[in-house]
Amino acid sequence: MAFKKSTNWIGGFLGMKLLIDCDYIVYKCCASTETEMDFGEDVIVVTSDFSEAYKSVQRELNKVKKEFGDFSEIILFFTSPNNFRKKIFPEYKGHRNRKKPCGFKRVINKLKEDYKVIVRDGLEADDTMGIYQTKYEGNVIVSPDKDMRQIAGKLYDFKETVDITPDAGARWHLIQTLSGDNTDGYSGVPGVGVKKAEKIFSEKGYTWKAVVETFIDKGLTEEDALCNARLARILTVNDYDSKKKEPILWTPSANYRVDSGTEAEAQTDGASTK
């Protein structure tokens, strides 16, 4: 699925905030500064140079700022230790049992002192960025995660900046529902990848009916389809109850569809996700 490359460069970004997925940056920088010390016998110790790890993170953040001009304000987003998706599907990201690299938490704590940082309990950084971007439009999401293609607006993936329309974002959500995400631990429809999902939707239209039919054709159920759709969904401002401080689980109407030139319509516990 193609997304339009942004041509609104430098001057057009004046006054925008850069919403940065900092989980990725901190993990990468801390891992790169780890050192293994072998004392022989059964003792091997992994150490890290905190100062170098922190400087590495700052260098990465400065690179991003320079990409858009130093006038850009940055906000760093991190994932909460709790995750609402585990209540939907306990095995969600269950295979990610590798410990964080040395210094990971300490670097984050230092960043909280030096930068504006946002973490929402129960949410991943992706969700918090999605909520912020759809509440305060006109900013740039900075993330290599393909999930962020669901969120309308500008997305910089560390290679290029693309403009994502509401329709394109809604279509990508349905594609991910069918194709699943092995990295996150939900399978979608067996044997259906992104290319095949696009082919199915090109023939049947981007509808909830097409999603359900594809799941049923493989011996699965509509409940399976809804579970995958909720796991795949990156939250927007309309998917979050700010008073209760909890997600509003995505619930499509039977005739949900995404039409070019119109907004997708869904019913989410009585709230429209337009």
Where are the regions that the model predicts?
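Positively charged N-terminal leader segments that act as targeting/secretion signals
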Residues: K5-T7
